[in-house]
C-alpha cells in the first residue's frame, strides 16, 4: 500500500489536482484483478541480469481479445483506472468493453508494485531504460500470460513512448497501436532539459547523499512541482484558473502543501529512463495500424516543431489526431481524459485488420 500511495502522490503533484475538471462516467466494468509474475534472468541493457517482479492488473477474461494498456512516468496501473480513462473506455458499449476485451495493465519496471530500487537495492539496482521496460512488458504478456498476439497496444505519456517502441520492436505482435501524449523522436530539446533540471535538483540536494538518504530529499517536492507546472496543465486552462497573482499563488501553495511520498531513487530512475528514448530508427518497421493522439497544447510535445508530422510520414499505416487546445484541455495531461478521443479509438478498432490471434 505504501508504494501505491507514493505513485498516487507523484501523479497528483504533476496534475492540476482539483483544477482538473474532467467529467467521466463511473466505472461499471468488471472488478480489476491483480497478479505478479517473475521474469527470471531478465537482462538489462547494461548487461546486468536478475529476477524481476512484474505486477499487473487485468480486467475482463483471458478469452477476450487482449489489449495492453501502458501508464505514464511515476505511475502504475491505478492511473489507468480513473473515471476519466477507464470509466470512459472499459464499460459496456465503450471502445474497450471488458466483456469483449482482455485488458492487461502492467506496472512498469521501477514502478508501482514491480521491482524497483526502493525494494532494497537502492542505487545498486540496474539502470533501466524504455527498451528494458518494453522487453519486460513483452515477457510478461507472452511468457507470463501466454498471449500470442495483441489486438491493441495503447499508452499515455511514458506509456505512449513505450507504444512507439512496441510497434517497431515487435511489429507483428499487434493489430493496432495508439501512442498518446508522445512523439516518435529522440528525447531532446526542452522536454529533456526540464527533466534533467528536475533530476539534478534532487541529486544536488545534500539530503540525497548519493542515494543513501535517511529521509527523502526536501528539494524533491519543489523539483517535481516546478516540472509539473512547466510541462503540464495547458496554457489556456492556467490562464482561466489563475488570471491573477493571488489565484496563481493559491495554486502553487496548494501543490506545495501536498506530501510527496515517492522514493527519490525510484523517481530518479523512472525519469532518467527516458534519456536515450528514440524510436525513430524503427518507424519504417511498424506494421500495425497506428493512431497517434496528441493535444495541441501539449507542453512536452509541441506540435509546432513539426517533428511528429515529419515522423508520421514514415509510418505506413499511421495517422495523427490532434486534440484542439481549449480551456477544457490540460496540455500534456489532456489525453488522460478519453472523452476527447473515444470516438476515434472506436473507429480504429472497427477498421484495423485483425491479423493472427
Regions found by a protein language model. Give the residues of each.
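Short beta-strand/loop motif that positions the catalytic acidic residue
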Residues: 286, 292-294
